[in-house]
């Protein structure tokens, strides 16, 4: 089970809802992924205008936990305002903190992310900050009392996969809260690798919505995450420089 705050989930796949070709494809992809947590950008959805079509109208919201994010925020104050807007609309108190510090790389601003997380914790939110793979920053966020850490595998939407597995492994090893790898996942193999490293979950969007067949890719991601988790729990063999015979040599007869 994936435990975040007082919530528990069977699925370790968190799915973003942006950039799908249409609502029908989006819904089918969500269904086959079996994701229980769906994230969306509050600023890109007019949640107070009933005349505007949006994701919330199309979903059976009782089946999912909605994770609004603060995408578009440039500083902590903007992130807090967006989070409060989401809460006022009756959505879950869980919030993904996203404060971008660089428009080219879309990497998070570490100072403002820390500040926003602290402010939102004081407001009673369940806080999940999107961060880089900075090991020290992840620890400082954890010390604040956030409910999960969401380090990026690589820049948002890049599809580069996990470019720094060593740092991710350090973050996972020191974690006392769930670690959900977020951003940069491009394939089911990337998602499986994140889980093999010991991540508690994976959040992805573009890898599914931008695929040639988003529905098939959503299912593939589900399987990749499940396989990676099983592999982590099973425990891989140690890496060795030299070969080891897989068949026992004792008792074998020698042909003259």
UniProtKB/Swiss-Prot annotation:
Q: Give the Enzyme Commission number.
A: 2.8.1.10
Q: Which GO terms describe its molecular function?
A: thiazole synthase activity
Classification via InterPro entries: Aldolase_TIM (IPR013785), Thiazole_synthase_ThiG (IPR033983), ThiG (IPR008867)
Task: Classify the main location.
Answer: cytoplasm
Keyword terms of this UniProt record: Cytoplasm, Schiff base, Thiamine biosynthesis, Transferase
UniProt pathway = Cofactor biosynthesis; thiamine diphosphate biosynthesis
Q: Does the keyword Magnesium apply?
A: no
What GO CC terms are in its UniProt record? cytoplasm
**In which domain of life is the source organism classified?**
Bacteria
UniProt subunit comment:
Homotetramer. Forms heterodimers with either ThiH or ThiS.
Listed name of the protein: Thiazole synthase
What is the organism field in this record? Answer: Bacillus mycoides (strain KBAB4) (Bacillus weihenstephanensis)
Organism lineage: Bacteria, Bacillati, Bacillota, Bacilli, Bacillales
């Amino acid at each position: 089970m994936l435990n975040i705050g007082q919530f528990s989930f069977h699925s370790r796949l968190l799915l973003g809802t942006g950039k799908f070709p249409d609502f029908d494809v989006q819904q089918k992809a969500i269904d086959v992924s079996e994701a229980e947590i769906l994230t969306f950008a509050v600023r890109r959805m007019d949640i107070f205008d009933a005349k505007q079509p949006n994701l919330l109208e199309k979903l059976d919201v009782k089946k999912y936990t909605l994770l609004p994010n603060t995408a578009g925020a440039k500083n902590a104050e903007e992130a807090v305002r967006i989070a409060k807007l989401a809460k006022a609309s009756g959505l879950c108190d869980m919030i993904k903190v996203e404060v971008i510090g660089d428009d080219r790389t879309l990497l998070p601003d570490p100072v403002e992310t820390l500040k926003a997380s602290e402010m939102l914790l004081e407001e009673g939110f369940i806080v999940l900050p999107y961060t880089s793979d900075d090991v020290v920053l992840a620890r400082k966020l954890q010390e604040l009392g956030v409910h999960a850490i969401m380090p990026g595998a690589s820049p948002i939407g890049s599809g580069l996969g996990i470019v720094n597995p060593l740092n991710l492994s350090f973050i996972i090893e020191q974690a006392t809260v769930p670690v959900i790898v977020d951003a940069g996942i491009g394939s089911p193999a990337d998602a499986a690798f994140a889980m093999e490293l010991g991540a508690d979950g994976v959040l992805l969007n573009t890898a599914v919505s931008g695929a040639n067949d988003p529905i098939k890719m959503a299912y593939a991601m589900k399987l990749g995450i499940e396989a990676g988790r099983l592999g982590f729990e099973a425990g891989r063999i140690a890496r060795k420089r030299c070969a080891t015979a897989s068949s026992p040599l004792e008792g074998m007869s020698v042909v003259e």
